[in-house]
Amino acid sequence: MKALWAVLLATLLTGCLAEGEPEVTDQLSWQSNQPWEQALNRFWDYLRWVQTLSDQVQEELQNSQVTQELTVLMEDTMTEVKAYKKELEEQLGPVAEETRARLAKEVQAAQARLGADMEDLRNRLGQYRNEVHTMLGQNTEELRSRLSTHLRKMRKRLMRDAEDLQKRLAVYKAGAREGAERGVSAIRERLGPLVEQGRQRTANLGAGAAQPLRDRAQALSERLRGRLEEVGNQARDRLEEMREHMEEVRSKMEEQTQQIRLQAEIFQARLKSWFEPLVEDMHRQLANLVEKIQSSVATNSVLSTSVPQENQ
């Protein structure tokens, strides 16, 4: 658990440092393994084509086909991101509730930034279409130049948004795959390059500029460590309370079982005391009846023997 806060802190530092970099690569830096990444790549490829501002692009911009296609690609990307985030939430291991909420909030913020910049791009293309219509066939080269500049800026923003979202989803995925303490080593391995990159960027900063950042990072890490330890202690206390409660329930159940057994034995003894006199009385009556029957049979035998002798 203590190593998890360090990984999260390194990811946060990397994201903060990335905001100060003026240059952004033109290619996405991951392989398209997840459906949301594949959907984003389709959006990215289409945007690259739009940025050429070729005659075909100009024609499709005028009839709204470009904005319609971008809308579909945006919705597909956001839908896949939501589905992937939900899948990770269902797989999330026994992470502390505060950690779970913080990870979800960070992913939600990155997702919102990407969606907002996509929406901004679509609105800018719609604005360009309206401006061209207003020009009524006049020279639109200046409009096209401004749009090209804006598209380059938007492309960089979208690239940063996409990479930030991917990094935060990677942290979320690591937590879902490994759980809390059981996943620390695996999270470190998966995010090792990211942590190293953050360290290198921090080291490259000037000593004067880096020291305040290190101080803030140290203070933040101390707060995170203290909070994580507090949450861990609370979880252990809660587990101990549950164990004591279960032991109390078990004792009560054993006591109730013993009482039921004693009551059953008492009831059995009562039944025996009720029915034994009846059985004994029935035995006596049956014995008397048998004795009477035997006596009667003997008497009849004597009488039947004496009658033939008298006739002779």
Curated annotation (Swiss-Prot):
<dbReference type="GO" id="GO:0032438">
    <property type="term" value="P:melanosome organization"/>
</dbReference>
<dbReference type="InterPro" id="IPR050163">
    <property type="entry name" value="Apolipoprotein_A1/A4/E"/>
</dbReference>
<keyword id="KW-0358">Heparin-binding</keyword>
<dbReference type="GO" id="GO:0033700">
    <property type="term" value="P:phospholipid efflux"/>
</dbReference>
<dbReference type="GO" id="GO:0097487">
    <property type="term" value="C:multivesicular body, internal vesicle"/>
</dbReference>
<feature type="region of interest" description="8 X 22 AA approximate tandem repeats">
    <location>
        <begin position="72"/>
        <end position="247"/>
    </location>
</feature>
<feature type="region of interest" description="Lipid-binding and lipoprotein association">
    <location>
        <begin position="202"/>
        <end position="282"/>
    </location>
</feature>
<dbReference type="GO" id="GO:0042157">
    <property type="term" value="P:lipoprotein metabolic process"/>
</dbReference>
<feature type="region of interest" description="Specificity for association with VLDL">
    <location>
        <begin position="270"/>
        <end position="282"/>
    </location>
</feature>
<keyword id="KW-0597">Phosphoprotein</keyword>
<feature type="region of interest" description="LDL and other lipoprotein receptors binding">
    <location>
        <begin position="150"/>
        <end position="160"/>
    </location>
</feature>
<comment type="function">
    <text>APOE is an apolipoprotein, a protein associating with lipid particles, that mainly functions in lipoprotein-mediated lipid transport between organs via the plasma and interstitial fluids. APOE is a core component of plasma lipoproteins and is involved in their production, conversion and clearance. Apolipoproteins are amphipathic molecules that interact both with lipids of the lipoprotein particle core and the aqueous environment of the plasma.</text>
</comment>
<dbReference type="GO" id="GO:0042627">
    <property type="term" value="C:chylomicron"/>
</dbReference>
<dbReference type="GO" id="GO:0033344">
    <property type="term" value="P:cholesterol efflux"/>
</dbReference>
<keyword id="KW-0964">Secreted</keyword>
<comment type="subunit">
    <text>Homotetramer. May interact with ABCA1; functionally associated with ABCA1 in the biogenesis of HDLs. May interact with APP/A4 amyloid-beta peptide; the interaction is extremely stable in vitro but its physiological significance is unclear. May interact with MAPT. May interact with MAP2. In the cerebrospinal fluid, interacts with secreted SORL1. Interacts with PMEL; this allows the loading of PMEL luminal fragment on ILVs to induce fibril nucleation.</text>
</comment>
<feature type="repeat" description="4">
    <location>
        <begin position="138"/>
        <end position="159"/>
    </location>
</feature>
<feature type="signal peptide">
    <location>
        <begin position="1"/>
        <end position="18"/>
    </location>
</feature>
<keyword id="KW-0162">Chylomicron</keyword>
<keyword id="KW-0813">Transport</keyword>
<feature type="repeat" description="3">
    <location>
        <begin position="116"/>
        <end position="137"/>
    </location>
</feature>
<keyword id="KW-0325">Glycoprotein</keyword>
<feature type="modified residue" description="Methionine sulfoxide">
    <location>
        <position position="135"/>
    </location>
</feature>
<keyword id="KW-0967">Endosome</keyword>
<feature type="repeat" description="7">
    <location>
        <begin position="204"/>
        <end position="225"/>
    </location>
</feature>
<keyword id="KW-0732">Signal</keyword>
<dbReference type="GO" id="GO:0005543">
    <property type="term" value="F:phospholipid binding"/>
</dbReference>
<dbReference type="GO" id="GO:0034364">
    <property type="term" value="C:high-density lipoprotein particle"/>
</dbReference>
<keyword id="KW-0272">Extracellular matrix</keyword>
<keyword id="KW-0850">VLDL</keyword>
<dbReference type="GO" id="GO:0008201">
    <property type="term" value="F:heparin binding"/>
</dbReference>
<dbReference type="GO" id="GO:0070062">
    <property type="term" value="C:extracellular exosome"/>
</dbReference>
<feature type="repeat" description="1">
    <location>
        <begin position="72"/>
        <end position="93"/>
    </location>
</feature>
<keyword id="KW-0345">HDL</keyword>
<dbReference type="Pfam" id="PF01442">
    <property type="entry name" value="Apolipoprotein"/>
</dbReference>
<keyword id="KW-0445">Lipid transport</keyword>
<keyword id="KW-0558">Oxidation</keyword>
<feature type="region of interest" description="LDL receptor binding">
    <location>
        <begin position="150"/>
        <end position="160"/>
    </location>
</feature>
<protein>
    <recommendedName>
        <fullName>Apolipoprotein E</fullName>
    </recommendedName>
</protein>
<feature type="repeat" description="5">
    <location>
        <begin position="160"/>
        <end position="181"/>
    </location>
</feature>
<dbReference type="GO" id="GO:0055090">
    <property type="term" value="P:acylglycerol homeostasis"/>
</dbReference>
<dbReference type="GO" id="GO:0120020">
    <property type="term" value="F:cholesterol transfer activity"/>
</dbReference>
